[in-house]
Structure formats: C-alpha cells, structure tokens
C-alpha cells in the first residue's frame, strides 16, 4: 500500500497517528538542522519535518529532493508550533521516519502554484503539469460535480441517457464540419457531429419520450474565448411538450445546479424577454442584466437641429452611466477610440455630462440649446453626476450592436459585472429566418427543424421574414448557456421549411430523407434544449475563457500544442485512404 491517508485530510484529531502519505514535492526549505518539505496530492498539502539531530541520513536524503519528485513518507502526526491558516492541514505536520523516492523529476518549466510564471502557450504545452495546480484542478472538479448533478436531476425527471453516433453524415448548412475519410468506402467521408439534433429527434419518433446525453460536439469555426473546436453539450429532448413545458423543466435544472453547486437560490421565475426587445433595448440577443444602461432612442429629440451627423442618421441611441460624469477628457477620448476600433466600427461618440446644478454639458453644445439637452436628460432619467454616451448610424441594427459593445465596456470600467452575481433570463420569439443579402436567400436562424410560432404559420406564405420561431435561449450574465426549440413534427410543414431555405426536393431527401421518412411513421410533438457544459462551468467558476475548465483544450488556432495536433499523416496512411494532399498556395 502506497498510502494510508491523503495529503489533505490530516487534522489535530489525528495527532500521534503513524501514517503513510504519497505525492509530489511542492517545495523544500532548510532552517538550521531542520528540513521542511511540502508534499502535495489532489487533496491538499501537508508539511513534512526532517530533523538532522534525530536522523542525519534521512535529513540528507530529504535535502536532495527536487520540485515535483514523487515520494512516499511514513511518520507521526504532530501539532505544528507555527500554524498555517491558509490550508486545511495547517494545524499539523508529519515527523518523518521513512522516505522513499518513487520517481525523480526534471525542473518544471514554470512554477506549479496558484500564481504561476508560465504563459498560456507554455502551460498548454505542459498541460499535464498545469493540471497539478490546485486552481486548475478545482475547475475540473467543479465540472465533474456539475455533470453529476445534471445526471441526477434528469434521472429523477425520467430522462434516459442514450449515446448517439460520432461518425455521421456531413450537412453543409451551418458551421463547417470536421470530416473523416472512410477507408472501407473510398472517396466517401463521415463528419463529426455538430450536435446530435436529428438523432435525438429520431429517438423521440422511437418513443423514448425523454432523452439526454452529455456529448462531445465538433465545429470547424473560428475560435474565441468561449469557443473550442470540440465542446461538450448537455443535450436533451422531450416528447409531447410545448415551449412552456421545456422552459419549466430546464429552468428547474438550472436552479438545481445553482442551489447545489453555488449555494444560490432563485425563488422567482427567470425573466423572459423577446428577441425584439433584447435587440432594441440592449443591442444583443444575450443581454447582461447585472446592470442597467438600457438603450434610449433619441431620434425625436436630437434630429433637426443642424448637427449633420445626427440629422442624417437612421438611428440615434444612447446609454446613461450613473455617476460617471467625473470621467476626464482623456477617459472620454479613450472611449471614443474604443468605439472606433474595427471590432466595434462606430464613426464617433457624443457625450453629455449632467452637472451638479442639473444643467447638461455636451460635446455638441453649439448645436443644441439647454432646453433640448434637458429633454434628452429627462429621456434617460439622468441625475446630476451621470454621463450620457450617444452613438448614431445609418443602420439601426448595426448601431445598436456597437452601442452594446460600449455598454459592456462601461459595465467593466465601472465594476458592474460582478462574477458572483447571477441574473438569468429566457430570450424567446426569435425570428425563424435570417435574410442574407449576398446570397439573396433565407437561412434558418437556429436550424431547419425549428418549428414556427403557431400564430405565425400563415405568414410562411406571405412574409417569411416576419415569422417568429418557437425557439428560446437561456442567458446568464450575458452568456448564452443554452438554447433550443420546439421541433417540426409534421412532414408537410418540414417540406415547406426546406423550400423556403432554398432546398430542392432532391437535396432535402439526400441530406435529411432518413428524418422525413421517420416522420411518416408517426412523429410525436417534441422539443428540447442543449446547454453548453463548458460555458456553464466557466460561468460558475468565474472564468473568462472556457479553456480553463477543459482538461486538454486547443489554443486559438485550433491546435493542441501538447500533442502537436493536427499533424501530417504518414504517406502509407494516405494511400490506404485513397487520399492525395494538394495544398493550394
């Protein structure tokens, strides 16, 4: 037996016990004739003591230990004279009587502690060392607990966990697929699933009623802090349900996770907001409601006063930052540069301060009387000490999105985006279609199987762009953690949907014939939702990137720098797969 206890569970009550521990050397330090060694495992750290006067040979052996050596020690638990309140084992130490070096180690390329000197690339290259850090390991422990609680909740609600295939057919709609060549079928390819969407619908046709799966999904798309080429979904589907049934079920799951994992209890139902209102009031379909700064439209007030930027604009809108009138000219110039960055794309920024006497001082004073500025102030409900920031443009939707970026930046600067505060809402009534000007055709905003709102079905023939989807997203703190819809279960309605999306009958049959055929054998009304487990965990952990809650993530170029993947295939493998690599310069 390598150990009788772990490095994190000894306490004062264990004083006098003889125990054996095993783990990694965190650090060593010498003080006079004493050597102190911190031994670490997944469970914690324990201080070891070696005494030169008691056993000189053993102490000399301890002096030769390096960082990250793997050791086994046996000794007696004793109360520490100098206690460490920062660790659970800080009241005790182990007086070592026996030391075995199980493995030596090279000097690590970075310090394996809470605060490390390793950059992102270095830590990803040596991810197996980075995972020894307690702060990283805790994220994966949190992930385990959340996945466990998801399974427990859904099991109690009658869901069955069913695995679906990883090798499926490619579907050109949506993000790019990762493709896998088939050796046994030369010239043909599998695709890795972007989601088990059609397969879980088939399970509903099969009569499984309630399905879930914690499943890997794959999308070959450009990466951001909240995206990875492979990610994990909590994928769910239910039969004989309407939208309200799905929302209640998965709001219940979110509340369960918050209560059990974070100790946060939501007694009220989550807020609901239409997509139209979210875009109009916050410029985003995933608004962060931890703070205010709701958009105020100023077309009626600010147009027609000789300021050509506003007079020629299709949209004028602004936000009110409470207490920010103290912003200096330098800070305001920095905000102007922020909105003019290519990532935001605004042409400029107009600001107005509400002075202590209630008067308004703006950057466009020469065009506006105090009477007009007071009317603007009242539209915001602004008070003395507040700062009003205004953007305008010739495209209302685009300008709202720019204003959204400014709002989030102000939220950051004013410390209003507290990671320990959670505001949850459902965004509902999404458009069913998005119009693409370049292609001159509609695309599904979610996917082709999303059911239209029953009230809007007649509009499919007359005004498809006005049709609302029976779809919903769960948004927490400005992060879309989950989304889903009620699905089409009628083959005739599905045919109409494909036609509106530009599918020929042959193409629809080729790509989705298996699903259309299944519908002919009695498909129940059904709907579902998928949570992004990575995003959910990063939200609970207060992380800025989902990479930190994935054991072996890819970098922003989609590479695994530890495995050096993707890599070049051996020519013999290419021959076996009947493939030729011809990279276009």
Swiss-Prot record:
Question: Catalytic activity annotated for this protein?
Answer: tRNA(Asp) + L-aspartate + ATP = L-aspartyl-tRNA(Asp) + AMP + diphosphate
Gene3D superfamilies per UniProt: Bira Bifunctional Protein, Domain 2, GAD-like domain, Nucleic acid-binding proteins
Q: Which residues are noted in the entry as L-aspartate-binding?
A: 173, 219, 446, 487
Q: Which domain of life is it from?
A: Bacteria
Q: Which Pfam families match?
A: GAD, tRNA-synt_2, tRNA_anti-codon
Q: Which keywords has UniProt assigned to this entry?
A: Aminoacyl-tRNA synthetase, ATP-binding, Cytoplasm, Ligase, Nucleotide-binding, Protein biosynthesis
Write down the top EC class of this protein.
ligase
Per UniProt, where does ATP bind?
Answer: 219-221, 228, 480, 532-535
Entry's Gene Ontology BP terms: aspartyl-tRNA aminoacylation
Q: Where in the cell is it found?
A: Cytoplasm
Family classification: Belongs to the class-II aminoacyl-tRNA synthetase family. Type 1 subfamily.
Stored NCBIfam families: aspS_bact, PRK00476.1
Known HAMAP family for this protein?
A: Asp_tRNA_synth_type1 (MF_00044)
User: What's its job?
Assistant: Catalyzes the attachment of L-aspartate to tRNA(Asp) in a two-step reaction: L-aspartate is first activated by ATP to form Asp-AMP and then transferred to the acceptor end of tRNA(Asp).
Protein name per its UniProtKB record: Aspartate--tRNA ligase
Give the species.
Parabacteroides distasonis (strain ATCC 8503 / DSM 20701 / CIP 104284 / JCM 5825 / NCTC 11152)
Q: Which gene encodes it?
A: aspS
């Amino acid at each position: 037996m390598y150990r009788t206890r772990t490095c994190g569970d000894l306490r004062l009550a264990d004083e006098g016990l003889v125990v054996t521990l095993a783990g990694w050397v965190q650090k060593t330090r010498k003080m006079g004739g004493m050597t102190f060694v911190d031994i670490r495992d997944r469970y914690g750290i324990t201080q070891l003591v070696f005494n030169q006067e008691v056993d000189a040979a053993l102490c000399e052996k301890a002096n030769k230990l390096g960082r990250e050596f793997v050791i086994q020690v046996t000794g007696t638990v004793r109360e520490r004279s100098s206690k460490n309140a920062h660790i659970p084992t800080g009241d005790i130490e182990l007086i070592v009587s026996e030391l075995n070096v199980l493995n030596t180690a090279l000097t690590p390329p970075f310090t394996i502690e809470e605060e490390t000197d390793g950059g992102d690339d270095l830590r990803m290259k040596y991810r197996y060392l980075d995972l020894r850090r307690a702060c990283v390991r805790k994220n994966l422990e949190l992930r385990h607990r959340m996945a466990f609680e998801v399974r427990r909740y859904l099991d109690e609600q009658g869901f069955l966990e069913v695995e679906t295939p990883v090798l499926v057919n490619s579907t050109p709609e949506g993000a790019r697929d990762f493709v896998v060549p088939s050796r046994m079928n030369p010239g043909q390819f599998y695709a890795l699933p972007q989601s088990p969407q059609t397969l879980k619908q088939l399970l509903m046709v099969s009569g499984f009623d309630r399905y879930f799966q914690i499943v890997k999904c794959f999308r070959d798309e450009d990466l951001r802090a909240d995206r990875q080429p492979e990610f994990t979904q909590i994928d769910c589907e239910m039969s004989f349900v309407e939208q309200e049934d799905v929302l209640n079920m998965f709001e219940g799951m979110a509340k369960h996770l918050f209560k059990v994992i974070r100790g946060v209890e939501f007694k009220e139902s989550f807020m609901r907001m239409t997509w139209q209102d979210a875009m109009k009031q916050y410029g985003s379909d995933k608004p962060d409601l931890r703070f205010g700064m709701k958009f105020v439209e100023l077309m009626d007030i600010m147009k027609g006063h000789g300021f050509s930027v506003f007079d020629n604009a299709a949209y004028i809108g602004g936000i009110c930052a409470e207490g920010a009138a103290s912003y200096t000219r330098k800070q305001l110039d920095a905000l102007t540069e922020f909105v003019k960055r290519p990532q935001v794309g605004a042409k400029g920024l107009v600001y107005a301060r509400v002075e202590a006497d209630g008067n308004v001082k703006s950057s466009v004073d020469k065009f506006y009387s105090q009477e007009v500025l007071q009317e603007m102030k009242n539209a915001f409900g602004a008070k003395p000490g507040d700062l009003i920031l205004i953007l305008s443009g010739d495209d209302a939707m685009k300008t709202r999105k720019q204003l959204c970026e400014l709002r989030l930046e102000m939220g950051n600067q004013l410390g209003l985006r507290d990671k320990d505060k959670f505001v949850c809402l459902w965004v509902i009534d999404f458009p069913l279609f998005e119009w693409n000007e370049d292609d001159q055709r509609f695309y599904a905003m979610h996917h082709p199987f999303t059911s239209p709102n029953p009230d809007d079905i007649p509009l499919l023939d007359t005004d498809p762009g006005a049709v609302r989807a029976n779809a919903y997203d769960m948004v927490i703190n400005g992060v879309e953690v989950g989304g889903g819809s009620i699905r089409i279960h009628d083959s005739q309605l599905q045919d109409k949907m494909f036609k509106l999306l530009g599918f020929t009958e042959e193409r629809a049959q080729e790509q989705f014939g298996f699903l259309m055929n299944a519908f002919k054998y009695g498909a129940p009304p059904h709907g579902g939702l998928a949570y992004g487990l990575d995003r959910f965990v990063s939200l609970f952990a207060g992380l800025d990137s989902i990479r930190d809650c994935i054991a072996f993530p890819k970098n922003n170029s989609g590479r695994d720098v530890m495995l050096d993947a993707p890599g070049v295939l051996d020519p013999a493998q290419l021959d076996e797969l009947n493939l030729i690599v011809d990279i276009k310069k």
